Amino acid sequence: VAEISYFLLASSDMDIFTDGDFSASDNTSYETGRERLEGSKSQGLNHSDPLDMFIGIELLQRFKPLFLPLYCLVVVVAGVGNSFLLACILSDKKLHNATNIFISNLAAGDLLMCLTCVPLTVSYAFDSHGWAFGRPLCHLVPLLQCATVFVSVLSLTAIAVDRYVVVAHPVRRRISVWGCGAVSLGVWLLSLALAAPQSLYIRYMDLRPNGIDLVVCEEFWPHTGNLRLLYSCFTLIASYMIPLLSVSVSYCAITVSLKRYSVPGEPSNSQQRWSQRRRKTFSLLVASVLAFALCWLPLQVLNLLLDLDPDFYIIGKRYINVLQICCHLVAMSSACYNPFIYASLHSKVRLHLKGYLCPCRNRQSEMVERAMSRS
């Protein structure tokens, strides 16, 4: 879902590195490996020169001074913002409700993605030696990266369902904190299960014994059938369409419920406060889903194009690496926005922020509030 392909190979190119003539265990020289690559043209293994796969990497290295600071900025902003959001929700018992628990689950997924997956993936994209973190992490990082996307999707869906229940059935007892914890655990387990097919086809190939100073960690799906395309379509629906659909259905259902149960006449102050509070919470949900959808749209479209065009007729190999990095950077930036959206719509979070930034001033305000409450 959020993968950057460093070593772009058409499906047929995998034969070059996995057959008996060119395996990591052989003592084949670099020249022999190059001849094997050149020979693939005459054998009809690919419609273009397999050495073209390295052209995009050369172009990508030119943009390295631009992309690395941007990625560092994303990691710092998302790391600090989501850590602060988690600290606010976990430290204040008044914030322990269903919506905030699901928001903390969303923040935990974004934090995990930005602090673990993004640095390793970016290092792989820009390191001329390829994957430098060993075989276990080669399989684990793509799994976590894909799973965190599903965690975000399912958490946003859970928030949408919770908002509908609160508005449409206000007298119904809300789910407990322990119940929310169980749902959050289920979200993580389901996300790992949905991400598993991708990790099953990850291959770790060390080409250094063959005279090529490169370690490859990539997806290689079977040649026969359309498993990769089917999984991409499933991922597009499950990780992109579901949150948009859930929020749309929730919004329509809430609108119908409010019109159905609205009481004629001037609403009381308590009703106005209740309506305003619910409107703010739903605005938070809509803003989060829109930010997620807009950030992930370029990468979703690009991944679908690559699956439909494995021979790179639509997008040339020279530009595909740079395009992947651009789309990946925009997608990863989605982890930065939720803390700001939540803080702008939640007064208690803003109070916590003031407390962290100006602790002395916060203590004075607390003393004034206590004095006024005693009087």
Spans of features found by a protein language model:
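Extracellular N-terminal segment of 7TM GPCRs
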Residues: 1-80
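Loop architecture of class A 7-transmembrane GPCRs
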Residues: 48-57, 125-147, 169, 175, ...
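Extracellular TM2-ECL1-early TM3 structural module of rhodopsin-like
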Residues: 60-72, 95-159, 166-177
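Helix-to-loop junction signature of class
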Residues: 71-74, 112-128, 142, 149-156, ...
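Alpha-helical transmembrane segments of multi-pass membrane proteins
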Residues: 75, 105-118, 146, 184-195, ...
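Cytoplasm-facing ends of alpha-helical transmembrane segments in multi-pass membrane proteins
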Residues: 79-90, 107, 111-119, 147-170, ...
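Intracellular effector-coupling site of seven-transmembrane GPCRs
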Residues: 212-225, 236-239, 256-299
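Seventh transmembrane helix
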Residues: 247, 289-304, 322-375
